[in-house]
Swiss-Prot record:
Dorsal portion of the neural tube (developing roof plate), and mesenchyme tissue surrounding the umbilical veins. The record marks L26, A27 as: Cleavage. This is Protein Wnt-3a. It comes from the Eukaryota. A lipid is attached at S209 (O-palmitoleoyl serine). Proteolytic processing by TIKI1 and TIKI2 promotes oxidation and formation of large disulfide-bond oligomers, leading to inactivation of WNT3A. Disulfide bonds have critical and distinct roles in secretion and activity. Loss of each conserved cysteine in WNT3A results in high molecular weight oxidized Wnt oligomers, which are formed through inter-Wnt disulfide bonding. Disulfide bonds join C77-C88, C128-C136, C138-C155, C203-C217, C205-C212, C281-C312, C297-C307, C311-C351, C327-C342, C329-C339, C334-C335. InterPro entries: Wnt (IPR005817), Wnt3 (IPR009141), Wnt_C (IPR043158), Wnt_CS (IPR018161). It comes from Mus musculus. Ligand for members of the frizzled family of seven transmembrane receptors. Functions in the canonical Wnt signaling pathway that results in activation of transcription factors of the TCF/LEF family. Required for normal embryonic mesoderm development and formation of caudal somites. Required for normal morphogenesis of the developing neural tube. Mediates self-renewal of the stem cells at the bottom on intestinal crypts (in vitro). Forms a soluble 1:1 complex with AFM; this prevents oligomerization and is required for prolonged biological activity. The complex with AFM may represent the physiological form in body fluids. Homooligomer; disulfide-linked, leading to inactivation. Interacts with APCDD1 and WLS. Component of the Wnt-Fzd-LRP5-LRP6 signaling complex that contains a WNT protein, a FZD protein and LRP5 or LRP6. Interacts directly in the complex with LRP6. Interacts with PORCN. Interacts with glypican GPC3. Interacts with PKD1 (via extracellular domain). Interacts with FZD5. SMART domains: WNT1.
Length: 352
């Protein structure tokens, strides 16, 4: 979470929240902590456009999964960027949970939209397969004929339904004829396509003594970490676009085209952006940068998590920490584990 002093500065900013996906705050606000005990109150979710409000009321039983999906997306973002200058910091007590970072059409904005959209599709799909909602369940659209020695069985996860929920809800506010809406729609879809392209068969053996005389198989989503890794690669290779304006019957419309014609045209699985990112080295409330001072760095790494790059050339401090940890653990039959407690010394390096 961001430091309090920085929050006070943020509060003084006049943020343009009209296009900000502030409904994401459902995943970190007080409603999230009470999901297991209280129903979702659609009217109390901040930032919903009328289409989202109608969707929430019609599908209220899957809204906890929507919140869980956004939460999973935020956590995966923080994992993927844990060693980078921008580490997906969230801002407490703010409807704009990422601060002004998402105001710009940068790579970071592209990734956050993609991983949040993917999170919603993933969580809804998994919840349906687990039988948590009466309006959805297992997929009845089994692709292909069974192979030799196996048959369809189990519960194939219905990514088409999960993707529909993500598309109808997450894309509902992205209907403006401007470049930013076009970018957000594209990256939201890239997140959903990341899951669809990683669906795979899972099988279970049946037979005496595990002989696997026959297998039953079903379609399953990958681990969400796989989706995070995939989208992080797409972040690193994101396509830079330029904005073009042209007149249509409804007025001026902004569209995106690749800045460099000698690169391949981005597919629906690629991320796109059209504004440069700040360097995130120093605190800057206008860009949402918290800087990298006091961040832990890896002194032995030459990558972005290394002290040279993460600390932006300012140097780093070194100290030792003594930590008490469990060690020499032994399993006893039956059934408990006993451990000793050891003191270990660690070298810690932090940015100046």
């Amino acid at each position: 979470m961001a430091p309090l002093g920085y929050l006070l500065v943020l509060c003084s900013l006049k943020q343009a929240l009209g296009s900000y996906p502030i409904w994401w705050s459902l995943a970190v606000g007080p409603q999230y902590s009470s999901l297991s005990t209280q129903p979702i109150l659609c009217a109390s979710i901040p930032g919903l456009v009328p289409k989202q409000l109608r969707f929430c009321r019609n599908y209220v039983e899957i809204m906890p999964s929507v919140a869980e999906g956004v939460k999973a997306g935020i956590q995966e973002c923080q994992h993927q960027f844990r060693g980078r200058r921008w580490n997906c910091t969230t801002v407490s007590n703010s409807l704009a949970i990422f601060g002004p970072v998402l105001d710009k059409a940068t790579r970071e904005s592209a990734f956050v939209h993609a991983i949040a959209s993917a999170g919603v599709a993933f969580a809804v799909t998994r919840s349906c397969a687990e039988g948590s909602a009466a309006i959805c369940g297992c997929s009845s659209r089994l692709q292909g004929s069974p192979g030799e020695g196996w048959k369809w069985g189990g519960c194939s996860e219905d990514i088409e339904f999960g993707g529909m929920v993500s598309r109808e809800f997450a894309d509902a506010r992205e209907n403006r004829p401007d470049a930013r809406s076009a970018m957000n729609r594209h990256n939201n879809e890239a997140g959903r396509q990341a899951i669809a392209s990683h669906m795979h068969l899972k099988c279970k053996c049946h037979g005496l003594s595990g002989s696997c005389e026959v297998k039953t198989c079903w379609w399953s989503q990958p681990d969400f970490r796989t989706i995070g890794d995939f989208l992080k690669d797409k972040y690193d290779s994101a396509s830079e676009m330029v904005v073009e304006k042209h007149r249509e019957s409804r007025g001026w419309v902004e569209t995106l085209r690749p800045r460099y014609t000698y690169f391949k045209v981005p597919t629906e699985r690629d991320l796109v952006y059209y504004e440069a990112s700040p360097n995130f080295c120093e605190p800057n409330p206008e860009t949402g940068s918290f800087g990298t001072r006091d961040r832990t760095c890896n002194v032995s790494s030459h990558g972005i998590d290394g002290c040279d790059l993460l600390c932006c050339g300012r140097g780093h401090n070194a100290r030792t920490e003594r930590r008490r940890e469990k060690c020499h653990c032994v399993f006893h039959w039956c059934c408990y584990v006993s451990c000793q407690e050891c003191t270990r010394v660690y070298d810690v390096h932090t940015c100046k």
